[in-house]
Swiss-Prot record:
GO terms for cellular component: mitotic spindle pole body; perinuclear endoplasmic reticulum membrane. It is found in: Endoplasmic reticulum membrane. Coiled coil: none annotated. Keywords: Endoplasmic reticulum, Membrane, Transmembrane, Transmembrane helix. It is a multi-pass membrane protein. It comes from the Eukaryota. The chain crosses the membrane at residues 74-94, 104-124, 531-551. One of its GO terms (biological process) is mitotic spindle organization. It comes from Schizosaccharomyces pombe (strain 972 / ATCC 24843) (Fission yeast). This is Uncharacterized protein C4D7.07c.
């Protein structure tokens, strides 16, 4: 029955083909056979009759062609639909047979069809997805925004907030009062001096004698180290701040003697001097002193510290240097004795609010020769300084110093601190995958099967795990692995995990870090290769390395561009220590730390 149907359909197809051949021959004959009668009629007698005959012939030809094409298209549509139905019927019969008679055969056939897909690991499926994504990204005339933000800049206020968030909450170190008692006592003395000056203005010399002759600091055993000529400028600076501020406060009018109208408070200037002196001895690394200065003197003084060295702690005490202060006080006493001797007509301890200023001025300007080697030159030099744009000059100097230190902190100090504060994006749990297109040597098929069934395998995906047991070893002198992150980011640091025990000959000599770019996407880097060298990392026991963006030969003309560039794929190339046929390289987790492109620094 089926054979007769097929024969009938083939006969119909043969008849249709014969009809088409006959129709084509008729059309060809009408076009090619010369019709002399019509030619003569059309040439010699161009009458409406000849034009009518020609139009009838053309209409018949077009009608025959359209009918033939319509019949032919209907025939092929019905024919292919019939073939599709027969194929579906045959497949259904085979499946029905397998289900009824051979269930095991059906299961094996199903597994055979889908085994290749099941054997592909997760990274392989992700690579397939990214392959099509990259193919679409490379389509011309596709708008892709550039990854460079030229307008990005580091502002001082953002740096201050960053500094405050990093070091502003370490309150656990402020209870170590034993190590900061000298500084507390000095603070108490200066505060008492300031209060006394507010209430009863007296001479600077009397203030020094009153506090330092009482020997309030003698009960503390202070640690003094390496007092030599190099320290003397710092000591003089410290003493100058104290005397200048006392002199300034004592000569303000009584109505202005409150903290709001004092250009620079006695405490703040003294603490600035303490900071400059302590910086020479690395005292600012002690968290106790940092906490004390931040609590008692405000954020502005605390920000003056050497913040790039805050990662260490040194147990040293502040040097109060009472003997040198006593000598200065004695010199001040001698100077005042000279002043009083030349002004014996006035009572020094009388109405101090009215007589003290004239006595000091007479001592400065009338008896400058007598007090030349003591305090006269110092008072005369600082008088105009404090009365001419004092606030503006000090604030400019303060902001300039703070901006430089915070800028230095942002660039260099993070590498000396724990990278745990920065998230690690090169982890499998956060979406990082290995791009096998830029990875060599390629993994073996047996390792892929072992990894799929949960067995120990030598795959580069081990680098996406922080476990010390996860490593990727190869008998090569050079290996390369590419890590694709789940989002673009600004890279700031990388961390290398290597065991500190065992044979270190398996460790690489150095690791080169590249950023993978697309020439179509990034117009600024269009004249370079796809791989941009970010850093060359020497492998050592140090687990932290800061990527130096400013030491790149390719960006020597515009070094600031690369710092603003973000990357989504990073390539690591490791070189063996032993360049031989038996050399082996073992890589462990390589952490990529930084900021996402939508985060603010």
């Amino acid at each position: 029955m089926m054979s007769r149907k097929r024969q009938a359909s083939s006969n119909d197809f043969f008849d249709m083909e014969q009809l088409l051949i006959a129709n084509d021959a008729l059309v060809h004959q009408n076009h090619s056979t010369p019709n002399h009668a019509s030619d003569e009629l059309s040439v010699n007698d161009p009458s409406p009759l000849s034009r009518g005959l020609q139009s009838d012939v053309n209409s018949n030809i077009s009608r025959n062609i359209s009918n033939t094409f319509f019949k032919k298209s209907i025939f092929f549509f019905v024919y292919y639909c019939k073939q599709a139905l027969e194929f579906i019927s045959t497949v259904f019969s085979i499946i029905k047979f397998l289900l009824n008679r051979r269930k095991v055969s059906f299961l094996l056939s199903f597994l055979l069809l889908f085994s290749l897909f099941l054997l592909i690991p997760n990274d392989g499926r992700v690579n397939i997805k990214f392959f099509y994504k990259d193919f679409v990204d490379r389509i011309p005339f596709r708008f892709i925004p550039s990854n460079f933000n030229i307008s990005f800049g580091k502002h001082l206020e953002q740096a201050k907030s960053l500094f405050k968030s990093k070091f502003g909450n370490s309150s656990s170190t402020y209870n170590e009062r034993d190590s900061i008692m000298p500084l507390l006592k000095l603070q108490s003395n200066l505060t008492e001096a300031k209060t006394l000056l507010y209430q009863n203005p007296i001479s600077p010399e009397d203030v020094l004698l009153h506090f330092w002759d009482r020997n309030l600091m003698s009960t503390y055993d202070l640690k003094i180290q390496d007092i030599n000529d190099s320290v003397n400028p710092l000591l003089n600076t410290y003493l100058d701040f104290i005397e200048k501020d006392i002199y300034l406060v004592s000569h303000l009018p009584v109505s202005e003697k409150h903290p709001g109208n004092i250009p620079i408070s006695l405490v703040n200037k003294s603490v600035q001097a303490i900071c400059s002196f302590a910086e020479h001895y690395n005292l600012l690394r002690n968290p106790s002193y940092r906490g004390f200065l931040r609590i008692n003197n405000g954020e502005s003084i605390f920000n003056l510290l050497c913040i790039e060295d805050l990662h260490e702690s040194v147990n040293l005490d502040i040097l109060c240097l009472k003997d040198i202060l006593r000598n200065i006080a004695q010199s001040s006493k001698e100077a005042m004795y000279i002043v009083k001797r030349h002004n014996s007509s006035q009572s020094f301890y009388g109405n101090r609010s009215t007589t003290n200023f004239s006595i000091i001025n007479s001592g400065l300007y009338l008896k400058k020769d007598a007090a030349k080697n003591l305090l006269a030159k110092q008072f005369d030099a600082t008088y105009s300084y404090y009365h001419k744009d004092l606030e503006e000059s000090v604030h400019q100097k303060l902001n300039s110093n703070l901006e430089k230190r915070v800028e230095k902190y942002i660039k260099h100090s993070c590498s000396q601190r724990n990278v745990a504060d920065h998230p690690d994006f090169a982890l499998k749990v956060v979406g990082a995958v290995v791009d096998y297109g830029w990875t060599f040597p390629k993994p073996k098929f047996s390792d892929i099967l072992r990894d799929y069934w949960g067995k120990k395998a030598n795959l580069p995906t081990a680098l996406l795990d922080t476990s010390i047991n996860s490593n990727w070893c190869n008998y090569e002198d050079t290996v390369q692995v590419s890590v694709r992150l789940n989002r673009p980011m600004y890279v700031r640091h990388i961390s290398l995990i290597f065991p500190i025990h065992g044979d270190d000959s398996y460790f690489p000599r150095e690791i080169q870090m590249f950023g993978l770019i697309n020439d179509i996407n990034y117009q600024i880097l269009s004249n370079m290769n796809n791989l941009v060298l970010l850093a060359t990392i020497p492998v050592s026991l140090s687990s932290v390395f800061e990527v130096n963006y400013y030491y790149l030969p390719k960006f020597s003309d515009t070094p600031g561009l690369l710092e603003e560039a973000y990357f989504n794929t990073f390539v690591f190339r490791a070189f063996s220590k032993n360049e031989s046929l038996t050399s082996q390289i073992c890589l462990y987790h390589i952490g990529i730390h930084g900021k996402e492109i939508n985060e603010e620094f």
